From Swiss-Prot:
Glycan-modified residues: 156, 296, 455
Membrane spanning stretches: 527-547
Entry protein name: Leucine-rich repeat, immunoglobulin-like domain and transmembrane domain-containing protein 1
Function: Photoreceptor synaptic protein essential for normal vision. Involved in synapse formation in cone photoreceptor cells.
Organism: Homo sapiens
Compartments (UniProt record): Endoplasmic reticulum membrane; Cell projection, Dendrite
Length: 623
């Protein structure tokens, strides 16, 4: 017994002091001899019931593997006593958070592997405590973003695996650092290689991935990717498309297009404010008033074929309260840009010059030599409003973005042709029979005929208050010969002309109307219809009642007479049966009424079809 105890004591004394009682009970420890003769201890803990890292890890451990456990978090400075630790592997645990001090004291750490956990965030600043770290494996976690400041903590890495996370994009600072790798710290003739794992992430393919796509195309020769066939997950139109097939544009801040700074509109009319901007991605457009009042209109958004984003603010029936500055804003993630458009609401001018002759129906002279006239030999032509006197163009006029257009008058010859000879007779007379078919106090519908027009022929409708020089233009889509003009003033006389776009309207292509005449006529017609229907009802109703009463009275009399006949016993004269030529007895041809029927058990009606019985003539009479 004493000998056995002595042997055990000797064995205990001979055991290395580093391993004496240091290996945790839930782990396994092993000692390896390295090539240089040094010893390296490896500790492996894979108990599924382990919830925290063990506290009694040997301080000479160089490799620590805590895998497939129930560890959810790592306390701060949990590994600080392990000053010789070079590899820290924590794969396939339940880690959901890491302490920013978890790497404190690990100056020799070269590998940090955390795949298969539940990390939604990573303490990037903790990498400062591990200056020799070269490998960081964060595969199969729940990272949704990498902050821009993380780029300066990842400069020394040669292997970074961010695959199978929830990354949609990477910060520009990180991509730039990868694209400009320095080679000074590497031996001459050796180029640094950085291995990146970015596959299996839901990438949002927009301009922010422009530089990353170029990296995959071999733009940075010092980079190597675990998987180069990255694919888009959004937007839906690009889902599943490989990066190699993308044609992305560089991001660009919003830039507003210069436009009109001030717009004038008549009181009660419709004002249209337009604003356009370019940017990558396309900017979001919005309107607001400079004085903070709410907008009294509708906003429409559209994107033109060249990628310009347009926003249109329509203000119907403007009043003086709508006057003021309107701010158009274009915004994307790179910034915002604004412009101010002023709206001035003016009173509609009234005509003060009148004359009884047809030649002075409509005349007004504007500033700067602009004028408009309407008579038997003058027609209106519209050109964009300019400060100098307007002159006739030799080619088709270019449509202006302004709504208000001025009129220029010119003389027509006896044949009704245009004096400038710009359009042929067939083109000038293409529009015929301009009529007003519908009218309200604020709108009017015009129709016309254009039998020679083609499907591509576009028409323009010009209208203005009768006596004013300022006209508005409505562009009609090709193929249509009807248009409705809205935003008119009630009880106001207007003139409207229809012509082929780019041509001068002729006198017979214009029509003068008032916004109250047709409405009043329609109201009168409706009143006449109501009166006619009322008179018809008054006349027809008594006649209908009279006919019904007469029919009911006749019915009642018939029923009363029938009852009286059956209840009263009367004597009747009997009709004598006549003889036919064939020897048969027949009833006489006289009609037998209800009063002539005989009251008896055997009615004479039974024998009205009388006949021969037993070969003898039978004459029967009943009383």
């Amino acid at each position: 017994m004493r000998v056995a105890l002595g042997m055990l004591w000797l064995l205990a004394l001979a055991w290395p002091p580093q391993a004496r009682g240091f290996c945790p009970s839930q782990c396994s420890c092993s000692l390896h001899i390295m090539g240089d003769g040094s010893k390296a201890r490896t500790v492996v803990c894979n108990d599924p019931d382990m919830t925290l890292p063990p506290a009694s890890i040997p301080p000479d451990t160089s490799r620590l593997r805590l895998e497939r456990t129930a560890i959810r978090r790592v306390p701060g400075e949990a590994f600080r006593p392990l000053g010789r630790l070079e590899q820290l592997w924590l794969p396939y645990n339940a880690l959901s958070e890491l302490n920013a001090l978890m790497l404190r004291g690990l100056r020799r750490l070269r590998e940090l592997r955390l795949p298969g956990n539940r990390l939604a965030a990573f303490p990037w600043a903790a990498l400062r405590d591990a200056p020799k770290l070269r490998l960081l494996d964060l595969q199969a976690n729940r990272l949704s973003a990498v902050p821009a400041e993380a780029a300066r903590f990842l400069e020394n890495l040669t292997f970074l695996d961010l695959s199978s996370n929830q990354l949609m994009r990477l910060p520009q600072e990180l991509i730039v650092s990868w694209a400009h790798l320095e080679t000074g710290i590497f031996p001459p003739g050796h180029h640094p290689r950085r291995v990146l794992g970015l596959q299996d992430n839901p990438w949002a393919c927009d301009c922010r991935l422009y530089d990353l796509v170029h990296l995959l195309d071999g733009w940075a020769p010092n980079l190597a990717f675990i998987e180069t066939e990255l694919r888009c997950a959004s937007p839906r139109s690009l889902a599943g498309v490989a990066f190699s097939q993308l044609e992305l544009r560089k991001c660009q801040g919003p830039e507003l297009h210069p436009g009109v700074a001030s717009i004038r509109s008549l009181l009660g009319g419709t004002a249209l404010l337009r604003c356009g901007a370019t940017g990558v991605p396309g900017p979001e457009m919005s309107w607001r008033r400079a004085n903070g009042r709410p907008l009294n209109g509708t906003v429409h958004q559209e994107v033109s074929s060249d990628g310009t984003s347009w926003t249109l603010l329509g203000l119907p029936a403007v009043s003086h309260l709508d006057s003021g500055d309107y701010i158009c804003q274009a915004k994307n993630f790179l910034g915002a840009s604004e412009t101010v458009i002023s709206l001035i609401v003016t009173e509609p001018p009234t005509s003060t010059e009148h004359s009884g002759s047809p030649g002075a129906l409509w005349a007004r002279t504007g500033g700067g030599g602009e004028a408009a006239a309407y008579n038997n030999k003058l027609v209106a032509r519209h050109v964009p409003q300019i400060p100098k006197p307007a002159v006739l163009a030799t080619g088709p006029s270019v449509p202006s973005t302004k709504e208000e257009l001025t009129l220029e008058h010119f003389q027509m010859d006896a044949l009704g042709e245009l004096s400038d000879g710009r359009a042929g007779p067939s083109e000038a007379r293409m529009v015929r029979s301009v009529k007003v078919v519908g009218d309200t106090y604020h709108s009017v519908s015009l129709v016309w005929k254009a039998p020679q027009a083609k499907n591509t022929t576009a028409f323009s409708v010009l209208y203005a208050v009768f006596g004013q020089h300022s006209m508005r233009r409505v562009i009609v889509q090709p193929g249509k010969t009807r248009v409705t003009i809205t935003g008119l003033l009630p009880k106001t006389k207007y003139v409207a002309c229809v012509c082929v776009q780019g041509l001068v309207p002729r006198k017979e292509q214009c029509v003068i109307f008032s916004t109250n005449e047709v409405v009043d006529a329609e109201n009168t017609q409706q009143l006449i219809n109501v009166v006619v229907i009322s008179v018809a009802i008054v006349i027809a109703l008594p006649l209908t009642l009279l006919v019904c009463c007469s029919a009911l009275q006749k019915r009642c009399r018939k029923c009363f007479n029938k009852d009286s006949t059956e209840a009263t016993v009367t004597y009747v004269n009997l009709e004598r049966l006549g003889y036919s030529e064939d020897g048969l007895e027949e009833l006489s041809r006289h009609s037998v009424s209800e009063a002539d029927r005989l009251l008896s058990a055997r009615s004479s009606v039974d024998f009205q079809a009388f006949g021969v019985k037993g070969g003898r003539r039978i004459n029967e009479y009943f009383c």
